């Protein structure tokens, strides 16, 4: 099995890159691809850049040129579920765009014309994430809907909009729906496994920038454990 792993920022892929053996690096279209092995599993690690367009470009190249069997999207996310705290993990059951609106033509909020309203994560990959979680100490995870948009959600108005239209949302971020849509079009199974770097409506002693390395550590450890369990 070959596993594609996607993170947007350098901080989100550094730990995974350092865990890789026989690493080869290729840069293309503003993306960086690291191919090698982690825990004995063939992987291609993509640092895509931030946002949906960058994620879609990188994922397309990843799927077309490297042809992984499955894709895992890792990194950080903003928590919307009240049980989440900094460093907790979210596992996608489905992913939706929160900044897409063609409802005037009869589509659901968040649904792009010609696409499903939600992109369903792969059941086997979700179960693999749960098994990895069971082997990690002191790690809390929530499984559910993750929503994506090309905006850092930091205002009460935007939070209220997302909660109104996507009431079951557990977390938001800026790449997953583009990755999920691209995987859907390539018929490649995917799952999103991210760690919480900030939580809506909760005060934090640390800023997003300060907590990002810790969130990256948590999500990377989860991905490494998933890879270990694939053997």
Curated annotation (Swiss-Prot):
GO molecular function, one term: adenosylhomocysteine nucleosidase activity
One GO cellular component term noted in the UniProt record for this chain: cytosol
Function: Catalyzes the irreversible cleavage of the glycosidic bond in both 5'-methylthioadenosine (MTA) and S-adenosylhomocysteine (SAH/AdoHcy) to adenine and the corresponding thioribose, 5'-methylthioribose and S-ribosylhomocysteine, respectively. Also cleaves 5'-deoxyadenosine, a toxic by-product of radical S-adenosylmethionine (SAM) enzymes, into 5-deoxyribose and adenine.
Any one GO biological process: L-methionine salvage from S-adenosylmethionine
Residues that, per the record, bind substrate: 78, 153, 174-175
Cited PANTHER family: 5'-METHYLTHIOADENOSINE/S-ADENOSYLHOMOCYSTEINE NUCLEOSIDASE (PTHR46832), 5'-METHYLTHIOADENOSINE_S-ADENOSYLHOMOCYSTEINE NUCLEOSIDASE (PTHR46832:SF1)
Highest taxon in the source lineage: Bacteria
Name of the protein described by the UniProt record: 5'-methylthioadenosine/S-adenosylhomocysteine nucleosidase
Active site residues of this protein: 12, 198
Positions of disulphide bridges: none
Keyword annotations of the record: Amino-acid biosynthesis, Hydrolase, Methionine biosynthesis
EC number(s) on file: 3.2.2.9
Catalyzed reactions per annotation: S-adenosyl-L-homocysteine + H2O = S-(5-deoxy-D-ribos-5-yl)-L-homocysteine + adenine; S-methyl-5'-thioadenosine + H2O = 5-(methylsulfanyl)-D-ribose + adenine; 5'-deoxyadenosine + H2O = 5-deoxy-D-ribose + adenine
Pathway membership, UniProt: Amino-acid biosynthesis; L-methionine biosynthesis via salvage pathway; S-methyl-5-thio-alpha-D-ribose 1-phosphate from S-methyl-5'-thioadenosine (hydrolase route): step 1/2
Family designation: Belongs to the PNP/UDP phosphorylase family. MtnN subfamily.
SUPFAM superfamilies reported in the protein's UniProt record: Purine and uridine phosphorylases
Any Pfam family hit: PNP_UDP_1
């Amino acid at each position: 099995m070959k596993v594609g792993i996607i993170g947007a920022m350098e901080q989100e892929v550094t730990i995974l890159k350092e865990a890789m053996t026989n690493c080869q690096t290729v840069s293309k279209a503003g993306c960086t691809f690291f191919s090698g092995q982690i825990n004995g599993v063939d992987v291609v690690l993509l640092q895509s850049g931030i946002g949906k367009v960058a994620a879609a470009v990188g994922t397309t190249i990843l799927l077309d040129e490297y042809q992984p069997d499955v894709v895992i999207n890792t990194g950080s996310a903003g928590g919307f579920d009240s049980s989440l705290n900094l460093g907790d993990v979210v596992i996608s059951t489905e992913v939706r765009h929160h900044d897409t609106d063609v409802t005037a033509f009869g589509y659901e909020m968040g649904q792009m014309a010609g696409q499903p309203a939600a992109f369903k994560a792969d059941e086997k990959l979700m179960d693999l994430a749960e098994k990895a979680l069971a082997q990690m100490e002191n790690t809390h995870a929530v499984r559910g809907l993750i929503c994506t948009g090309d905006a850092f959600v930091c205002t009460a108005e935007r939070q209220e909009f997302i909660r109104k239209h996507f009431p079951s949302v557990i977390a938001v971020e800026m790449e997953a729906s583009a990755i999920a849509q691209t995987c859907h079009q390539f018929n490649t199974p995917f799952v999103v496994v991210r760690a919480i770097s900030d939580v809506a409506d909760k005060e934090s002693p640390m800023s997003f920038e300060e907590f990002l390395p810790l969130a990256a550590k948590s999500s990377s450890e989860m991905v490494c454990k998933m890879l270990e369990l694939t053997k």
